[in-house]
């Protein structure tokens, strides 16, 4: 890869298995506000730009997001086989449940709502303190044998939890969804501030970034424009004046929006990550997708990191 000023993007390991995927994954959490007709139009427009990967979860809109998407699949011109559909399960009201019975039932319900015979990826939404790897392995085997799920992954799992799961399951875990944005980049701070008596040096996730990169598990980044604990977007937020000034400067330089620069910052990392969008508006998704053609310089990447308030020892 070119060190500075180039346009070559990093290798996304998931693309070796699912060739239709790319740097952008369309998050469907807010699709309950759309009509099936609007979603169908979005699917076709994004397909024309090479964006074919959609992220669902059974809890999004209490299932309404998947239901409307399933209706849209019957209306759009893009064949189901061209799309990558992934969904997540395991979060119930007030507790987590990764039991065999719940996983199997959740997938059946997801498939019914999406009006499809299979998921390209099933992702375990969050770790369950009571999870038994042998139960999960049995569920995975049944789902794959029945043709209901092609591949599997996790979300918000530590390397240790992945190792525990891998001790029983027979399928490779292809993805780990993790929160990452320029301000919310603790997984990078702990590595950069190693051996320092600083807040940023604290390892909160078992060095998940290094581990996923070493294992070839693709990180899908959620909330790429958010900061704090669901406090909102950092774009144009008064708490981040220096960051927004630099984003504006780089946006002008590259002829894109600030959101595209924020996504390009994530895509610049050699781990080969994917950005999960959070918008229900086609234009905003296409706008962020311009990050696919950007390659920030090393100096620009570190400048954005520091502008968000992070420390370089």
Per-segment meaning from a language model:
Residues 22-27, 54-56, 83-87, 122-124, ...:
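Hydrophobic faces of well-ordered beta-strands that scaffold small-molecule active sites
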Residues 76-101, 125-126:
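Structural motif corresponding to the early beta-alpha repeats
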Residues 51, 116-119, 149, 173:
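A structural motif
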Residues 111-132:
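Active-site groove signature of glycoside hydrolases
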Residues 34-46, 98-114, 160-163:
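Short, acidic/polar
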Residues 2-83, 145, 217, 226-228:
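N-terminal binding-site loop/beta-alpha segment at the start of enzyme catalytic domains
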Residues 31-37, 57-67, 92-97, 127-132, ...:
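Acidic-and-aromatic substrate-binding clefts and catalytic sites of carbohydrate-active enzymes
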Residues 131-313:
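Beta/alpha (TIM)-barrel catalytic core signal, keyed to glycine-rich beta->alpha loops juxtaposed to Asp/Glu
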